[in-house]
């Protein structure tokens, strides 16, 4: 993840994706804790996710938000969509993301929608392939978003100008 993004300079919004009650079985019975999965973003090209565990739900969410702020990435956005089609993968979670025409909206489910909306993507088509576990879907989506390249990046890699590349 990109570490040079300062979360204090961004106006971050947070969204809780899941809160899960987990149990540790001990001799005297079960010990319950809560695991939270949170996505944060500024709706302007910066997004991150984090996890937190604690005895109480609010404390787990707070830990997850702090973790998410440490894992911010920058997402290239062209207009209201992404620059090109991309396939993100993590474990058995696969997410296919395609740019969409303006006015389409975010066509996506669950955790992927939370990431894309908080990243500031307004029009996109997505399809979840494989595992639908929230953590795997989030990591697969972030993997895809980190691999996005703008036309300027591709032109620089090829040693050409953007005009030569596009036309």
UniProtKB/Swiss-Prot annotation:
Coiled coil regions, renumbered to chain: none
Gene Ontology biological process terms from the UniProt entry: translation
GO terms for cellular component: small ribosomal subunit
Ranges of residues in domain S5 DRBM: 12-75
GO MF term (any one): rRNA binding
Record key words, sorted: Ribonucleoprotein, Ribosomal protein, RNA-binding, rRNA-binding
Record's comment describing the protein's domains: The N-terminal domain interacts with the head of the 30S subunit; the C-terminal domain interacts with the body and contacts protein S4. The interaction surface between S4 and S5 is involved in control of translational fidelity.
Annotated family: Belongs to the universal ribosomal protein uS5 family.
Subunit-structure text: Part of the 30S ribosomal subunit. Contacts proteins S4 and S8.
Role description: With S4 and S12 plays an important role in translational accuracy.
Protein name, per record: Small ribosomal subunit protein uS5
């Amino acid at each position: 993840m990109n570490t040079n993004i300062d979360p204090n300079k961004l106006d971050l919004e947070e969204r809780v994706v899941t809160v899960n009650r987990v149990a540790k079985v001990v001799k005297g019975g079960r010990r319950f804790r809560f695991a939270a999965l949170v996505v944060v973003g500024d709706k302007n090209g910066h997004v991150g996710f984090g996890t937190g565990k604690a005895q109480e739900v609010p404390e787990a969410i707070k830990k997850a938000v702090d973790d998410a702020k440490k894992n911010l990435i920058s997402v290239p956005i062209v207009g209201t969509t992404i620059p090109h089609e991309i396939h993100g993968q993590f474990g058995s979670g696969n997410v296919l993301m395609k740019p969409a025409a303006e006015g389409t909206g975010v066509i996506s489910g669950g955790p992927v929608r939370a990431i894309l909306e908080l990243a500031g993507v307004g029009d996109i088509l997505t399809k979840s392939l494989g595992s639908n576990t929230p953590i795997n879907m989030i990591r697969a989506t972030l993997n895809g978003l980190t691999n996005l390249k703008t036309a300027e990046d591709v032109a620089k890699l090829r040693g050409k100008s953007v005009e030569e590349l596009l036309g």
